[in-house]
Amino acid sequence: MSRSSKKSPFISYRLFNTIDKMNLKNLKQLVFTKSRSSTVFPSMVGHNISVYNGKNYVPFLILNQMISSKLGEFSRTRNFRGHKGINKKLIKKSSKKVTKNKKSIKKNIKTTSKKFKK
């Protein structure tokens, strides 16, 4: 469910104050925050913000395209390790079978070629 149109977008009070102070002093320092639910405002554009993802802080630069999105969208909380796929042991076993089959085929070819030469 979306936020009511009567309410303004949420931003952490502490985060808003630090960015406002940095804008007044023309500073561009890294800001650390745990507020993933804060909305990106136009005053934040150009600042480097590090958002906590539960394990460590993920830094990124705020761009114009990020306005009105949440800070949590830019720091992943889960790592994608890939789909299950084929087991590597099965691949090794199947490759061994193929090489054995190739060797047996070569032996058969040699024996049949000897038979035809006679």
Swiss-Prot record:
PANTHER family, sorted: RIBOSOMAL PROTEIN S19P FAMILY MEMBER, SMALL RIBOSOMAL SUBUNIT PROTEIN US19M
UniProt cross-references to Pfam families, sorted A to Z: Ribosomal_S19
Domain of life: Eukaryota
Compartmental location: Plastid
Record flagged with keyword Plastid: yes
InterPro entries per UniProt: Ribosomal_uS19 (IPR002222), Ribosomal_uS19_bac-type (IPR005732), Ribosomal_uS19_CS (IPR020934), Ribosomal_uS19_SF (IPR023575)
Protein name in UniProt: Small ribosomal subunit protein uS19c
Sequence segments annotated as region (Disordered): 92-118
Function: Protein S19 forms a complex with S13 that binds strongly to the 16S ribosomal RNA.
Gene Ontology MF: a single term: rRNA binding
Family of this protein: Belongs to the universal ribosomal protein uS19 family.
This protein's UniProt keywords: Plastid, Ribonucleoprotein, Ribosomal protein, RNA-binding, rRNA-binding
NCBIfam families, per database record: rpsS_bact (TIGR01050)
Main localization (coarse): plastid
Source organism (scientific name): Euglena longa
Lineage, top ranks: Eukaryota, Discoba, Euglenozoa, Euglenida, Spirocuta
Repeat in keyword set: no
Biological process according to GO: ribosomal small subunit assembly; translation
Gene Ontology CC: plastid; small ribosomal subunit
